[in-house]
Amino acid sequence: PGDEFLSSINLYGGSITQFVHSFKRLGWNCHFVDPSDPENFRRALTPKCKAIFIEVLANPGGIVLDLEAITAIAQDAGIPLIVDNTMATPYLCRPMDWGADLIVHSTTKFLSGHGTSMGGVLIESGKFDWAKDGKFPTITEPDPAYHGLTFYETFGDFGFTMKARTVALRDFGPAMSPANAFYTLTGIETLPLRMDRHVANAMKVAEFLDGHAAVDWVSYAGLKSSPYRQLAEKYMPKGAGSVFTFGL
């Protein structure tokens, strides 16, 4: 209780609701940051801040964040960078290549891909030093529920994963059913093919709308006119995803 974290304001609405309401009831406080200038994260840091959370490709606005710059700020602060990569998928963007410490996905969307199942995944890079500065005692100090076992000392580069699985999963129960796991794995088999098609279709539609007299604006990072085009080419060289917004 009392811990804080920073989050980009450009997020999926369900995440914002969770951070503002559900997490607050648990005593975790989120401070939202305008990510258009990465230095805004540095300016918002406090001694109680334990993480930075972002969507590298924001849902649904088609906004691309400067992943490398935000990673550097998190590293300077000694806190993990958590990236929601749902919209980009591992096929289009590899956040760990740019220094992300934890990645989360809603598998319900592109990974599953067929509307058959709901779920989520958590991936740990194994490179973050949880013992540094004593900021994360729940991972680095003995756990009485496991006879004094210290997760980071025992499991090393997958200590966070083991803590999440053996404690959070056990106590709160967010376990995927076998059927949902099967459908998700089946969907992942066609992820590259599907994402290539999604990107190609999205570009065609975005270009059409961008040139239509009745359309006021289109926010899609794949367009040449997008202010996020360079960031998209850097972090998502295979395409800027398939979710975007436009106004009339």
Named regions from a protein language model:
Residues 1-211, 219, 230:
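Conserved PLP-enzyme active-site core in the AAT-like
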Residues 217-248:
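Conserved PLP-binding catalytic core of the aspartate aminotransferase-like
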